[in-house]
Amino acid sequence: MKESNLVGDIRKLFVDFFIKNGHQLFPSSPLIVKDDPSLLFTNAGMVQFKHVFTDASNANVGTAVSSQKCLRVGGKHNDLENVGYTNRHHTFFEMLGNFSFGDYFKEFAVELAWSFVTKELALNKDKLYFTVYHEDQETFDLWKKISGFSENRIIKIKTNDNFWSMGSTGPCGPCSEIFYDYGEDIEGGLPGTPEEDGARFTEIWNLVFMQYNRKSDGELCALPKKCIDTGMGLERISAVMQGVHDNYDINLFKDLIKVSKKQSGNTNNELAHRVIADHVRSAAFLIAEGLTPGNEGRDYILRRIIRRAARYVYMLKYDGALMYQIFPSLIDEKSYAYMADYYPELINAKDLIISILKIEEENFKDTLVKALPLLEKELVGLSSGGVLPGDIAFKLYDTYGFPVDITLDIIKEKGIKFDEQGFYDQMDKQKERSKLNHSIKSVQQLKGKLWVDIKEHYGGTKFVGYEQYSTRAKVLSIIYEGDKSTEVANVGDRVNVLLDITPFYAESGGQKGDTGVFNVIVRQGKELLSCDDVVEVLDTKKVLDTLYIHECVIKTGSLIVGDIICAEVNCEKRKNLCANHSATHLLHYVLKSVIDRSIIQKGSLVSDDKLRFDFSYGVALTKEQLTLIEDKMFSLIRNNSPVVTHICDLKEAIADGAVALFTEKYEDHGVRVINIGDSKELCCGTHVRYTGEIGCFKIVSEASVACGVRRIEAVTGQHAIDYFREQEKMLHLIAESVKSPIDNILIQIDKLNRNNQELKQKLSDAYFSVINLQGIATDKIGSIDFLYSSLNSVPIDVVRKFINEHLVNDMIMFFSNVVGRNVMYVIGVASNLHSKIKATDFVEIIGEVIKSKGGGNNQLAQISGEYIKEVDVIFHVKNKLINVLRN
């Protein structure tokens, strides 16, 4: 294998060739598509240029080249279940592509393709074949002229395989594919023949000629600006260049599989190693873009990928997490699997990737251990061609969280079919059983129709809360009980109120809604001299994006549709909200600056009394890191930097470095950017004018909330001062309790702890004496010393400690400890006996007798339950031991 045939070198060769031929290099767009709701992930090179293809006449770029990260899991393109079983399917892959947006068309596209494969790649011309759409005589003639091939090497295809379209309407056109012949040793026929599904002839490049626009009636009209979109799978062309027929035999995958085999200690089961190698890449890139395993949307796709790989790790009989040990090859310059030169995000997020892979795989192992034996038991009576009942798969999914796609994987390997309809019938029944969900949905539907009607009638609410805290407004609508309109609300009524204009911020972007009051000032055209009609605003929500709904209670008088009111925001709460929201932006910036630049916001809550910030990070922050964060925050607050807001187009904001959240929806035009020093974020929330208004900042907690997600809770301003005072008060109380001055408190506590430990040891020694005095019986069962005793009210930790200190080889210790009407059984088994019997084995036997459950490990386990005569339990324990020795 030539050194220039490495995957990274082929990528560079492609990119450099097209740059040399006048193309502009575009970096890979993210896998997570943020502006196309029809796609979960980027699945082709043309995705980032979709808007250009649909409006090529106004394109500001003529030609482009890219190597695009792609993921095909879920939706129309889903290769997950095929990975490992075929030579060419991957979840993650790279697509090399060159593009023209009204610049050049077929002839130059064909010339470039021919030049690259025959000169740059130096492929044997005798190994190449072309396909064209059967009505595309122009491309047929171009290939014939440029390549000099005879007509039997240029194959006309009548199917839609050679006609590409973006959808049922829109840009479309014929395409031409380049095929590589692997030779007669491999089965398969030419494209268009009955044997075309064989592996001999492999498509290596697809050239799409977008020359038509398909109308809704199916008519094809010529596009004013014709475009080129090509795609060449990097892994597939690498296999050709490296002289192998299987993508998993290229250097990149061989290195990943090599590490998988070495770390697992299992060189067999090639299928498992292939799946693991593929899924490590997919998971790593998704985590690098900020995803964490979850139960919905893209997060669930990531979880499925990791769990599918974890199941194959389990098949290797490897006792531990494996994926995180394979990932470092992707960022190791000495490895053929090295990808971080082109995708530095892998290095930036390496700690997070390693942490999430390890934690998620370890967590799923528990599910596998419980669920797999149950599935295997159900499959015992099924032979190849049999059908697994859908209710069994549903039980595994519903009770144990065992993904149905993994069940499908397992039965596929055994040639067993799946009762898919039965599975979904059970899913439907579960939904029907959930009356709560049904009722909530019904209410939402009623509310939804009401608000749609209101929006159609009145339009959206004008929000003026960025500039002012109060305004005159007109009451447009009053709603009660969620879905009923009324003209009048009286004292004590709780209602939702819609105004034509409001200074009240509606909850969104993590920020809580404003509270405050309405005072009626004009009724039926008459100015009111006194404020007898007062409405308290408890919260403000947003419905259908533009309706600001005020949740209110009538405190005095009444409220009538048509009233003119003075709407006043609670200024103190709003100022606290502003301080906490600006502090959240600064915290995001500081975390990226001083902890890890790959950190991504996963969620936030901004209320008037605290802020909460969730972020992607795999391990707990140290005390030193938390102090560093606070110091940096204090510095930014003291700088008293101005908070600058400006409005611009979304693309302009992103290009300028503004942080956007994939969980939020943004308009293409008129997005709001908040600049606080070097922090830039798209945000619709309210903020302070200067950072000094935040006052101070204190972290009150830092903890894990999900796999790979940490949460910081903090307070600012007066709430931070109150927190400091509470801590000081607590310190004084502790000092009084331990009878020590504050500056000597740690020494005094240390002294008390030492005294406490000495007393605990004396108490433990006393209980040890009690255990010995109560008597320990010994039976010889084979070569094993079986020691047992009945105790009364001895602390369980003392019993466990006694066993740990006295257990020796060839010994089993069994203690019952009666406390009131309950009894605790503790069993210790010497380590040299674990191959025959474990402490948890006895727990299972005792559990059957006393109808209870326990736990522990191989050496020490315990179980408690209602007291039963001692002899009964000891009999079962001894009987279990005798049966083990006999077998």
Curated annotation (Swiss-Prot):
InterPro entries the record matches: aa-tRNA-synth_II/BPL/LPL (IPR045864), Ala-tRNA-lgiase_IIc (IPR002318), Ala-tRNA-ligase_IIc_anticod-bd (IPR018162), Ala-tRNA-synth_IIc_core (IPR018165), Ala-tRNA-synth_IIc_N (IPR018164), Ala-tRNA_ligase (IPR050058), Ala_tRNA_ligase_euk/bac (IPR023033), Thr/Ala-tRNA-synth_IIc_edit (IPR018163)
Name of this protein: Alanine--tRNA ligase
EC code: 6.1.1.7
UniProt KW keywords: Aminoacyl-tRNA synthetase, ATP-binding, Cytoplasm, Ligase, Metal-binding, Nucleotide-binding, Protein biosynthesis, RNA-binding, tRNA-binding, Zinc
The family this protein is said to belong to: Belongs to the class-II aminoacyl-tRNA synthetase family.
GO terms for MF: alanine-tRNA ligase activity; aminoacyl-tRNA deacylase activity; ATP binding; tRNA binding; zinc ion binding
Principal subcellular localisation of the protein: cytoplasm
Domain description: Consists of three domains; the N-terminal catalytic domain, the editing domain and the C-terminal C-Ala domain. The editing domain removes incorrectly charged amino acids, while the C-Ala domain, along with tRNA(Ala), serves as a bridge to cooperatively bring together the editing and aminoacylation centers thus stimulating deacylation of misacylated tRNAs.
Stored SUPFAM superfamilies: Class II aaRS and biotin synthetases (SSF55681), Putative anticodon-binding domain of alanyl-tRNA synthetase (AlaRS) (SSF101353), ThrRS/AlaRS common domain (SSF55186), Translation proteins (SSF50447)
Note describing how the cofactor binds: Binds 1 zinc ion per subunit.
CDD domains xrefs: AlaRS_core
